């Protein structure tokens, strides 16, 4: 049976992650309160941030920025999109 969490992003009970997706306290907090569906929303948002800001994930400054945005995305009312961002049309 799948592990269920009360997802902080979706505001409902949903299937939880299989393991902490990030090291440290933030990873533990995400594991305990974020669903798989919400994590996928973050992955898409993170990809957009990396592309729009032309970040290199191995750069310590970029990693710190993404960590802060991840915390905001899940626990502080949401991460904002870059100024002037236009979502691709389908």
UniProtKB/Swiss-Prot annotation:
UniProt keyword terms in alphabetical order: Iron
GO cellular component, one term: cytosol
One Gene Ontology molecular-function label: iron ion binding
Top-rank taxon, per record: Bacteria
Organism annotation: Thioalkalivibrio sulfidiphilus (strain HL-EbGR7)
Protein name: Probable Fe(2+)-trafficking protein
Family from the record: Belongs to the Fe(2+)-trafficking protein family.
Pfam families registered for this protein in UniProt: Iron_traffic
GO biological process: cellular response to oxidative stress
Protein's job: Could be a mediator in iron transactions between iron acquisition and iron-requiring processes, such as synthesis and/or repair of Fe-S clusters in biosynthetic enzymes.
Keyword Membrane: no
């Amino acid at each position: 049976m799948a592990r269920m969490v009360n997802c902080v992003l979706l505001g409902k009970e949903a299937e939880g992650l299989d393991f902490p997706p990030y090291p440290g306290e933030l990873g533990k907090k995400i594991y305990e309160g974020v669903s798989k569906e919400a994590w996928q929303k973050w992955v898409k948002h993170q990809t957009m941030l990396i592309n729009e800001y032309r970040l290199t994930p191995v750069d310590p400054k970029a990693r710190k920025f993404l960590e802060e945005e991840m915390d905001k995305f899940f626990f502080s009312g949401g991460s904002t999109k870059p100024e002037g961002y236009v979502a691709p049309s389908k």
